[in-house]
């Protein structure tokens, strides 16, 4: 207590709603309206979040180990974001997690879930999936991002990311599709949507695999988690994929790619994790992905839901708060969000 006269009179009453400007972090309404950008995306339909992987990396815990959960979510709010996905260093108690986020005006929008449908008994994945659904429901999320991790090379340090990827057999395709449809039904029954994350080093990486996947799964139960960075790294035109599947997309990752670093990764046969360390990925506006047509597709489709900045890189090289602010400014200037 400071004991300064009049200090308490300036504070909002307990439970009072913060003024809109105060909740906007670094981006007051006047600043966001400036810059000559168009109000392309509707704030009433689209929420803007950022992933914690820019602060601490779940696959390489030494990257950002100095960044606490409290620092991470405080900086997200300060940079002007509305929500976050769940990171490995977040509290496992949904009550504790939700309270910490409520204090900062943040919400949980999604969490990564690793399925092993083609290499392990279905029941094993289902049990883990149900536990995850229960947790996400408790913290108010409506999406669960699933990636099939059977035979994934993304975490193998000596495996070149553009080589040796597992290609599914017909039987494996059937197991994957059948299993995901079952999981999608479980999610639907709980008021949630299963969004599948195509990803480097996994069984759904290439354009052909994405197309076959989308042609095979039940469109009422399994949706797409679109990731601009993973499309670009895989040599796919992200505009083409998003335009084709925007009506079936229920979660979006905005990830940029540094083309020269990605080309070096291919030339020198880097693993996925080395590529992350060396800076293949970055925030929107800092790399070579053209986001203008992606924003236009999102706007024209009437998409409703979350778009999330996700850019895993070494926080010692790319200060997380600095890059969060950079991404937030870029998106504000180009979309009006």
Predicted features and spans:
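Short, Lys/Arg-enriched N-terminal segments with co-localized hydrophobic residues
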Residues: 26-39
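Acidic (Asp/Glu)-rich catalytic clusters
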Residues: 41-45, 74-78, 91-110, 128-141, ...
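Conserved, mostly hydrophobic/aromatic
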Residues: 50, 76, 84, 101, ...
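Active-site beta-loop-alpha junctions enriched in small/polar residues
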Residues: 53-55, 87-89, 113-117, 149-151, ...
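Active-site mouth loops of central-metabolism enzymes
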Residues: 54-67, 116-125, 166-172, 283
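Short, flexible, mixed-charge acidic loops at enzyme active sites
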Residues: 62-67, 151-161, 261-274
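Acidic/histidine-rich catalytic cores of soluble enzymes
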Residues: 84, 177-288
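Active-site acidic/histidine proton-transfer and metal-coordination neighborhood
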Residues: 122-224
């Amino acid at each position: 207590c400071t004991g300064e006269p009049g200090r308490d009179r300036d504070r909002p009453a307990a439970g009072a709603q913060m003024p809109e400007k105060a909740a906007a972090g670094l981006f007051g309404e006047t600043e966001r309206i400036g810059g000559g950008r168009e109000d392309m995306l509707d704030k009433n339909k689209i929420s803007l979040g950022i992933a914690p992987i820019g602060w601490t990396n779940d696959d390489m815990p030494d990257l950002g180990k100095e960044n606490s959960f409290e620092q991470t979510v405080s900086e997200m709010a300060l940079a002007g974001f509305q929500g976050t996905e769940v990171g490995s260093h977040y509290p496992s108690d949904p009550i504790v997690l939700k309270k910490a986020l409520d204090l900062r005006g943040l919400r949980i929008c999604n969490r990564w879930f690793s399925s092993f449908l083609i290499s392990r008994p279905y029941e094993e994945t289902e049990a883990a999936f149900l536990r995850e659904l229960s947790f996400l429901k408790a913290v108010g999320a409506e999406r669960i991002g699933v990636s099939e991790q059977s035979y994934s090379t993304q975490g193998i340090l000596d495996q070149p990311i553009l080589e040796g990827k597992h290609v599914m057999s017909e039987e494996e395709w059937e197991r994957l599709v059948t299993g995901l449809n079952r999981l999608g039904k479980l999610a639907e029954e709980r008021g949630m949507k299963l969004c599948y994350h195509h990803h480097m080093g996994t069984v759904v990486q290439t354009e052909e695999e994405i197309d076959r996947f989308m042609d095979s799964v039940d469109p009422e139960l399994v949706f797409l988690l679109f990731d601009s960075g993973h499309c670009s790294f895989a040599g796919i035109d992200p505009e083409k994929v998003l335009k084709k599947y925007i009506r079936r997309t229920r979660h979006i990752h905005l990830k940029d790619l540094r083309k020269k670093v990605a080309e070096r990764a291919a030339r020198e046969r880097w693993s996925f994790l080395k590529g992350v360390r060396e800076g293949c990925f970055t925030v929107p506006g800092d790399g070579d992905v053209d986001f203008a047509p992606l924003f236009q597709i999102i706007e024209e489709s009437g998409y409703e839901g979350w778009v999330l900045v996700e850019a895993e890189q070494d926080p010692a090289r790319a200060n997380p708060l600095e890059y969060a602010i950079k991404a937030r400014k870029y998106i504000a200037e180009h979309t009006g969000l």
